[in-house]
Amino acid sequence: MMITKQSYQKFALMRVFVFSLSAFIFNTTEFVPVALLSDIAKSFEMESATVGLMITAYAWVVSLGSLPLMLLSAKIERKRLLLFLFALFILSHILSALAWNFWVLLISRMGIAFAHSIFWSITASLVIRVAPRNKKQQALGLLALGSSLAMILGLPLGRIIGQILDWRSTFGVIGGVATLIMLLMWKLLPHLPSRNAGTLASVPVLMKRPLLVGIYLLVIMVISGHFTTYSYIEPFIIQISQFSPDITTLMLFVFGLAGVAGSFLFGRLYAKNSRKFIAFAMVLVICPQLLLFVFKNLEWVIFLQIFLWGIGITSLTIALQMRVLQLAPDATDVASAIFSGSYNVGIGSGALFGSIVIHQLGLEYIGFVGGALGLLALFWLRFITIKFKKT
């Protein structure tokens, strides 16, 4: 019996590991344009702020597609669905690597965004399902760790590959790694029937839960603020702080490394007081943005700010996702799809706001505007915390 139990634990952890790798590759490709923005803009003879709208387009496809695509695929067996999503993901990256103009690149990114829409709608509930019985919360933390490693390894490595070869090679390598993950998924994942996915009828039911709706609005607000600044952090560091490209790469690495600390803090502290944890994480996201320009030329201070910012955004993202799952246990996939959609509305809006700020005010102001949006989100958190204190 002990051997059987050990085998179960081993395979369950390996399956969680596959999902963590999947999160790594999806998050790497979503945000790697941030690390390659200047190179992509230069190759197409465009401005960084204009190319940055590619981030907005990607995010808005995800935000608009998450719920309807999840509902359309609600009855499909989950392993088969995941393999299809990875096939689409890989083919789209081949097109990205071959893109002969910006519009072809944009179209290829839309294919990736469609895969992303469904992947993040179903993954949180699936990783909890395949996890060992007493490791459900830790499994969600490992999923977030995969996302954090995308920032630690994916973005810096993507930037290094882009600098040594070119940005097209970065997308090609991502497609290659995704192929290996797809093979692991095919080999290790069990048959996963759709379960508690919810239906279209679940949507109005969820929308009648005011705290859940409040959390979705909070996600849009705080993520909009975050991505107003983060979408253009690479050109800010190079042009405003005037640090070298190597320092810029190292700062992206530090941001991702901080995400591991954020995942750890979530696992240790969230259950003790979820409301205070979310508020503290938001403060860590907001303050570095507001102070970014103030300390723009102090290298060690910028490193510290980026580290704290990375801790904040990672722990905040996991905490908000966990809160959504807690508030909607009867329709986890629908709730996750709306969460993913809300998150990507924030990404798209933030990248758009950042582009507008750069064109109207200047690159140096992105931190002030992003931080101000974060402060509005903090006030909203305070309001819903008081309003729904017993929920």
Curated annotation (Swiss-Prot):
GO molecular function: carbohydrate transmembrane transporter activity
Pfam families reported in the protein's UniProt record: MFS_1 (PF07690)
Subcellular localization: Cell inner membrane
PROSITE patterns on file: MFS
Transmembrane segments: 16-36, 51-71, 82-102, 103-123, 138-158, 170-190, 210-230, 247-267, 277-297, 300-320, 338-358, 361-381
GO annotations of cellular component type: plasma membrane
Topology with respect to the bilayer: Multi-pass membrane protein
Alphabetized UniProt keyword annotations: Cell inner membrane, Cell membrane, Membrane, Sugar transport, Transmembrane, Transmembrane helix, Transport
Main location: membrane
Keyword Cytoplasm: no
InterPro entries (UniProt xref): MFS, MFS_dom, MFS_Efflux_Transporters, MFS_trans_sf, Sugar_effux_transptr_put
Protein family membership: Belongs to the major facilitator superfamily. SotB (TC 2.A.1.2) family.
Function: Involved in the efflux of sugars. The physiological role may be the reduction of the intracellular concentration of toxic sugars or sugar metabolites.
Protein name according to UniProt: Probable sugar efflux transporter
Organism annotation: Helicobacter pylori (strain P12)
